[in-house]
C-alpha cells in the first residue's frame, strides 16, 4: 500500500538546528542540550510512496502514534489539520496521490523544558523567560516531539 522514505529531516525553528534521523525519538532524551531542552515547534519532513489511487469511497488517515503535544499535518503542501488530542490522526484523503507524496509534520511542545534548561544554565536558545509562577516543582523533563509510530488506516 505504501513505502516510507528511510529518513526524516527535522528542523527546530527557534534554534535553527536540523537533524536527519532514521527513527523518531523523544527530544527530552537527546544528548544535544539544544534539542533536549527545546521548547517550540520542529518540522519533520519525509516522503512516502502510495501504490494505488485512493478509491472515492475511502477515507485515508495518517496515524501519528504518540505526540507531545500537538501536530499540524501537511501532505503535498495541503493542510490536513492540527491535532492535539488522541487519537492523533489526520484525514489525508484529499491530499494523497498515487506515487511519491511529501509529508510535513509540525510538532509543538510546551514551554516547560526550555524553562528547565534556562534554570540549569542550558537554555536551548536565547530569550527564554516567563512572568508566570512556575507550577512544576519537579525538574524532570517532559517527553517531547513526534514519537510515532506512523501508520495509515483506511475506512470505507
Regions found by a protein language model. Give the residues of each.
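An acidic-aromatic loop/edge-strand motif
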Residues: 3-42, 96-156
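Short beta-strands within extracellular/lumenal beta-sheet-rich domains
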Residues: 38-51, 88-90
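Residues that act as N-cap/strand-start positions at coil-to-secondary-structure junctions
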Residues: 40-44, 56, 67, 84-86
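Aromatic-lined ligand-binding clefts that engage carbohydrates, nucleic acids, or primary amines
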Residues: 48, 54-76, 103-107
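Short, low-complexity Ser/Thr-rich regulatory SLiMs
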Residues: 50-52, 94, 154
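A short, polar/proline- and glycine-enriched secondary-structure boundary/capping micro-motif
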Residues: 72-75, 92, 114-116
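Short hydrophobic beta-strand segments in globular cytosolic domains
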Residues: 80-81
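A short, polar/charged loop-to-alpha-helix boundary motif
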Residues: 84-96
Amino acid at each position: 500500500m505504501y513505502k516510507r522514505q528511510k529518513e526524516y529531516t527535522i528542523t527546530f525553528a527557534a534554534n535553527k538546528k536540523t537533524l536527519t534521523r532514521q527513527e523518531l525519538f523523544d527530544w527530552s532524551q537527546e544528548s544535544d542540550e539544544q534539542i533536549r531542552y527545546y521548547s517550540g515547534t520542529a518540522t519533520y519532513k519525509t516522503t512516502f510512496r502510495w501504490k494505488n489511487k485512493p478509491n472515492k469511497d475511502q477515507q485515508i488517515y495518517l496515524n501519528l502514534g504518540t505526540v507531545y503535544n500537538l501536530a499540524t499535518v501537511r501532505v503535498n503542501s495541503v493542510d490536513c489539520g492540527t491535532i492535539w488530542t488522541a487519537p492523533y490522526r489526520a484525514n489525508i484523503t484529499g491530499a494523497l496521490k498515487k506515487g511519491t507524496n511529501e509529508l510535513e509534520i509540525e510538532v509543538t511542545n510546551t514551554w516547560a523544558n526550555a524553562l528547565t534548561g534556562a534554570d540549569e544554565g542550558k537554555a536551548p536558545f536565547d530569550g527564554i523567560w516567563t512572568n508566570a509562577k512556575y507550577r512544576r516543582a519537579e525538574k524532570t523533563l517532559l517527553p517531547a516531539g513526534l514519537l510515532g509510530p506512523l501508520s495509515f488506516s483506511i475506512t470505507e
